[in-house]
Amino acid sequence: MSLRFHTLPTLPRAVKPGCRELLCLLVIAVMVSPSASGMCPTACICATDIVSCTNKNLSKVPGNLFRLIKRLDLSYNRIGLLDADWIPVSFVKLSTLILRHNNITSISTGSFSTTPNLKCLDLSSNRLKSVKSATFQELKALEVLLLYNNHISYLDPAAFGGLSHLQKLYLSGNFLTQFPMDLYTGRFKLADLTFLDVSYNRIPSIPMHHINLVPGRQLRGIYLHGNPFVCDCSLYSLLIFWYRRHFSSVMDFKNDYTCRLWSDSRHSHQLQLLQESFLNCSYSVINGSFHALGFIHEAQVGERAIVHCDSKTGNGNTDFIWVGPDNRLLEPDKDMGNFRVFYNGSLVIENPGFEDAGVYSCIAMNRQRLLNETVDIMINVSNFTINRSHAHEAFNTAFTTLAACVASIVLVLLYLYLTPCPCKCKAKRQKNTLSQSSAHSSILSPGPTGDASADDRKAGKRVVFLEPLKDTAAGQNGKVKLFPSETVIAEGILKSTRAKSDSDSVNSVFSDTPFVAST
């Protein structure tokens, strides 16, 4: 029991002794009354501003609690409905209210009007099936809301409207089938929400086109493990990107990210999402996810690099800060060694090294429009000297190969079309052509004339051998008939060459006139 001792007022001496004792009793009675001192109920345990009424089979809040308490624990009771009258008194200083492990099935509007300054509300392990619009609208200062281990299957887009200071929201262990994207986009988005736990629900996929719009500082606190995801390369690229950025939501629960194929049955084996060569997803698909979240900047070792923050909210009323790959905060007008941030959002790396490569997040905060935007930029650091030498080697090899091919083609063309032909070759070609054309008109061509040149006289005479034909017809008595009634012409021509004699005279071996036997 908690008692307060106050200084009793000085009683007038004119009061009689009996009346004085009666007045003292009245003062003490007023001081220890429930409304003034807040005596601790028999079902609770009180410690100054902390009251615990756990596991007492309570269905409502005791009415004689001290009004200035800061923490009230009503877990493991039988509270089933939260309406406007479930708390009989107003707790203006109450900051933590614990209602886990009750039978709460519904929350009415105005249920928390008597606790306007709550910062932490625990409604976990109850029987809530949905969260309606403006359920928590009175809790303007609420920072942590625990709704895990319920039966929630529907969240109204305006369910958390007005909770502008909400930082952590626990929704794991429910029956949600869609990712609550309204928490990050739209009219009722929560700008300060940096922790969202929707693990172990029934969410089959993530809206990839919208999740890329979530600022980086909010992405770090999204927990998705334990959901029955459908295997997809886009989901894999998102999670592997978070894993490479060392998000605790993926690093700490790597083995709890699983998926199933469409063809799998309900009880089929789950596949690990975060594994190498997952479903043969191409590297371009994975990189596409990286690029969608920002830009890529190339820097050279030892050369000053300037990276601009391409934010749509950037103007004179915008403040910029950067977050490095190691979660180091980079701000303007601060000594950060190798880094420097200007007021226009530009990041300068004076002497980049390989260890400076990674994903940098630029956070632009517009004071006038009350907007903020996060731009993720991938900075790659490479060695210009090494890359240049490799480039020159590749160029030299390609140029040599091309030159060799051109030279080969030129030589082939020269060989085909520019081969020299001597005069003797041309003369022989002409003679062969003439002899073939005159074969049908004459049996033998005439020999060279007397005025022929010396070269022409080198050639021998042409002769014709006539093949005798046997006529087996009757009346020939086996005689050989050289020429039958119809003349048969043999066109076999034999060329012979006789060397020139010392006296420069050329004799004919055979006459030009063919010998014909008479019949």
Curated annotation (Swiss-Prot):
Chief place where the protein resides: membrane
Membrane side Cytoplasmic: residue ranges: 419-519
Every LRRNT domain range: 39-67
Region (Disordered): 498-519
Protein name according to UniProt: Amphoterin-induced protein 2
Summary of the tissues where the protein is detected: Highest level in cerebellum, retina, liver, and lung. Lower levels in cerebrum, kidney, small intestine, spleen and testis.
Membrane topology: Single-pass type I membrane protein
Transmembrane segments: 398-418
